[in-house]
Amino acid sequence: MSIFTPTNQIRLTNVAVVRMKRAGKRFEIACYKNKVVGWRSGVEKDLDEVLQTHSVFVNVSKGQVAKKEDLISAFGTDDQTEICKQILTKGEVQVSDKERHTQLEQMFRDIATIVADKCVNPETKRPYTVILIERAMKDIHYSVKTNKSTKQQALEVIKQLKEKMKIERAHMRLRFILPVNEGKKLKEKLKPLIKVIESEDYGQQLEIVCLIDPGCFREIDELIKKETKGKGSLEVLNLKDVEEGDEKFE
């Protein structure tokens, strides 16, 4: 699809339109194809690599630019770059049925790949294959959302799959080195955030090796920094606690 803008008659090609309805009116932006998903997933961070122009339209294909008063009424501002960001993040990508089908298939597989990479069978600590996760996603009738990143959706899928199969996020293995004086007291505060304590060593400092849920990492890191006033340290030994070997659950 090619369009002309009425103000400067610059020809825009390879256009992907993102649309949002707000305050009873339609607003559109012109993006480069294949860049919208990259922006939403966080891979692409340069707005100029995504937007063909920072203008907001009511109809991209006709080159009709939105009126300033309509932008203020709908978005509370006439800052077109900021409005473009809102539409880019939350709007609906206008694509053909064939393009949409291809996009959904790719996102479905990407989500399954993330889940397979992050999760294991909790009983065996063995990872699952992407094919098995895809099959499980179809069994729960998971519907891909194009306005959410694949990472966000992978976390949703994990929650839903837990109700149907033995699956959990692979634990992270950490080492804490804490001042002895604060160590024992801090250990009690850390306990609810720790899955398994593998070893403890009391010497001049308290050293603990443990497994945690990855979702607790930030809270643990902040707690150690706060309680030890920067004297304690945290080291990631393994991002994923997975059994050695090539065997995967099919």
Curated annotation (Swiss-Prot):
Changing residue 67 to E: In SDS1; uncertain significance. Widely expressed. Keywords: Acetylation, Cytoplasm, Cytoskeleton, Disease variant, Nucleus, Ribosome biogenesis. GO terms for biological process: bone marrow development; bone mineralization; cytosolic ribosome assembly; hematopoietic progenitor cell differentiation; inner cell mass cell proliferation; leukocyte chemotaxis; mitotic spindle organization; rRNA processing. It is found in: Cytoplasm; Nucleus, Nucleolus; Nucleus, Nucleoplasm; Cytoplasm, Cytoskeleton, Spindle. One of its GO terms (cellular component) is nucleus. GO terms for molecular function: microtubule binding; ribosome binding; RNA binding; rRNA binding. InterPro entries: Ribosome_mat_SBDS_CS, Ribosome_mat_SBDS_N_sf, Sdo1/SBDS, Sdo1/SBDS-like, SDO1/SBDS_C, SDO1/SBDS_central, Sdo1/SBDS_central_sf, SDO1/SBDS_N. The keyword Protease does not apply. It comes from the Eukaryota. Belongs to the SDO1/SBDS family. Required for the assembly of mature ribosomes and ribosome biogenesis. Together with EFL1, triggers the GTP-dependent release of EIF6 from 60S pre-ribosomes in the cytoplasm, thereby activating ribosomes for translation competence by allowing 80S ribosome assembly and facilitating EIF6 recycling to the nucleus, where it is required for 60S rRNA processing and nuclear export. Required for normal levels of protein synthesis. May play a role in cellular stress resistance. May play a role in cellular response to DNA damage. May play a role in cell proliferation. Associates with the 60S ribosomal subunit. Interacts with NPM1, RPA1 and PRKDC. May interact with NIP7. Found in a complex consisting of the 60S ribosomal subunit, SBDS and EFL1. Interacts with EFL1. Interacts with CLN3. It is linked to Shwachman-Diamond syndrome 1: A form of Shwachman-Diamond syndrome, a disorder characterized by hematopoietic abnormalities, exocrine pancreatic dysfunction, and skeletal dysplasia. Intermittent or chronic neutropenia is the most common hematological manifestation, followed by anemia and thrombocytopenia. Some patients progress to bone marrow failure, myelodysplastic syndrome and malignant transformation, with acute myelogenous leukemia being the most common. Exocrine pancreatic dysfunction is generally the first presenting symptom in infancy. This is Ribosome maturation protein SBDS. It comes from Homo sapiens.
